[in-house]
Amino acid sequence: LIGHHETDGWVSDYENQIEAAFNLYKDHGVQIVKTGYVGKLLDGKERHSSQFGVRHYRKVIELAADKHIMIDNHEPVMPTGLQRTFPNLMTQEGVRGQEWDAWDKDGGNPPVHTTIIPFTRGLAGPMDFTPGTFRFENPVLPQTRVQTTLAKQLALSVVLYSPLQMASDEIENYERNPEPFSFITTCPTTWEQTIVPEAKIGEYVTIARKERGNSGRWFIGSITNEQPREMQLPLSFLDKGKRYLSLIHISEPTRH
């Protein structure tokens, strides 16, 4: 169970209520809060990246830490590594995430987008891109289609690092696709080792991550832009002399 605090940018009103809200969550065992600040200005006058905004974001994270609550911050300031001081800051948006696919008239993010952000926004820390879209047609905008595939949505859980993953689709769409959804529910979010066997910014990327602990399991995500291609995956990072069983999710050849 995750609490959602959408402030609409009115942070002074939020600060007047936040401690009571966090106390309520603590009493009921709610351990995660997703905050939001939709709007160009905070309190109608301050930029998100202003001193006013930075102090507010830190205040929320500090208070949440005191209540043992984790934060997923949307519409944040530029990531600065604050999660090193406050590890309850699990992840942040700060990226043109998958929500754009829901309302953009051109179908949202183009396939090339996710081959770029691991090397730009991804360098600044965990990002909540909200992968996991299983239905690609939009009845609200019937002329559009989300520019992705089911296999790519699963791969993004590995390619885009976030210790807290938020799946983006409706429950009914997951119930209709139980096998791929099981990948989302079992894919780790913290890793012991990460390597990049093959990548070219804006074209393709393959990322392999080893699950933390003693399982020895590796998870590999591989994505491309609009162009189909065959990619090489050297497996030299696997333990020599050990046998592995692979479960592979793959897109149709005509999709990306």
Regions flagged by a language model, labelled:
Residues 68-75, 100-102, 165-174, 193-195, ...:
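Acidic/polar loop patches that form or flank catalytic/metal-binding clefts of enzymes
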Residues 1-139, 143-149:
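Aromatic- and carboxylate-enriched substrate-binding clefts and catalytic-loop regions
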Residues 239-247:
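Short aromatic-acidic-glycine turn motif
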Residues 201-240:
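Carbohydrate-binding surface patches
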Residues 246-256:
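Residue-level detector of conserved catalytic or cofactor/ligand-binding positions
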Residues 71, 159, 220:
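Conserved, mostly hydrophobic/aromatic
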Residues 151, 155-197:
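Catalytic cores of secreted or luminal carbohydrate-active enzymes
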